[in-house]
Amino acid sequence: MIRWLAAFFCSLIFAGVAPAKPAFEIREKITYSTVGDRALLLDAFIPNAAGTHPAVLVVHGGAWRSGNRRQLRAYATALAERGFVCFAIDYRLAPKHKFPAQIEDCRMAVRWIRKNASHYKVNPDRLGAIGYSAGGHLVSLLATTGKPPSDTNGNIDTRIQVAAAGGAPTDFRWFPDNGRWAEFWMGGDLTSKKELFLAASTAAFVDAGDAPLFFFNGSADELVPEAWTKACYFALKSAGVKTEFYSIANAGHMQAAMDPGALEKACDFLASVLVPEHKTAGSGENAVSAQGDPSADSSSDSAISKDLDHECFVGKPVG
């Protein structure tokens, strides 16, 4: 009897409480490009709030040969809840599709977003990207190699304003086995395909005009060690580009992908560029932090910079 009365009174208390309205809607399986007979799809996460919003391209990982647009739904959801329009994309995968197919698809997605901005409440001048692992590599490459329109006949700008790259390899010019591990993706080793390895190397394209870049990486990541990501971080820092590196203590490659602290920092960094009025405590250019403690990584820059010559990049650059 007591249990029944408790349930009855609870029902009275909550009877007038309507379910919370979702902060955004999801539109799935939208074709952003067709290559041959293959339709490339995306899912759009659109805030319900009125007006236009900054947009973020979400690019999945999977070693450039697996994965799909649903893989980083947690990233898209977190950003959409903050008021960003998010577009999570599929792209062509190796070994059937060799590089540069993957980055070409990312650029096609950027063009599509800008072309269709008015249909998705997007401010086309505020476009960023986030990705992890292979996706982190691709968004970092977007940030350093985007191109302005080459003419006035409808060509659309592929430059983005900011990127957040997690677990991202950024330099493919140095490898101990001559890059044979990447033959499935490049179509050859470092000697035979040196131009492609160079074209895939984010760090090789860094200059002062690049978009700001936020990196996050697990300190125990053996698949993509921090030194591999730091190659680009140091290059950007030297060029005077706004950049941050967030180290996730004791995290491996998969653990770092869903670290809530890293995702929050990435969202904050994207907002700091795409939403000019956005402010976060302790934010600033070229900040390095580990588990939210800036002092925890105060000596790591010099230590990891020394590792660049022997931990990940054993051998000599080709070309």
What are the residue ranges of the model-derived segments?
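N-terminal cap/lid segment of alpha/beta-hydrolase-fold proteins
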Residues: 21-50
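Mobile cap/lid helix-loop segments that gate and shape the active-site cleft of serine hydrolases
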Residues: 35, 173-205, 211
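C-terminal catalytic histidine-bearing segment of alpha/beta-hydrolase fold enzymes
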Residues: 43, 216, 227-292, 301-315, ...
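Short beta-strand element of the alpha/beta-hydrolase
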Residues: 52-61
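A fold-wide structural signal in alpha/beta-hydrolase
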Residues: 55, 80-87, 92
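Catalytic nucleophile-loop/oxyanion-hole region of alpha/beta-hydrolase
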Residues: 67-69, 75, 87-124, 256-262
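Primarily recognizes the serine-hydrolase "nucleophile elbow" in alpha/beta-hydrolase
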Residues: 111-177
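Short beta-strand/loop motif that positions the catalytic acidic residue
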Residues: 215-217, 221
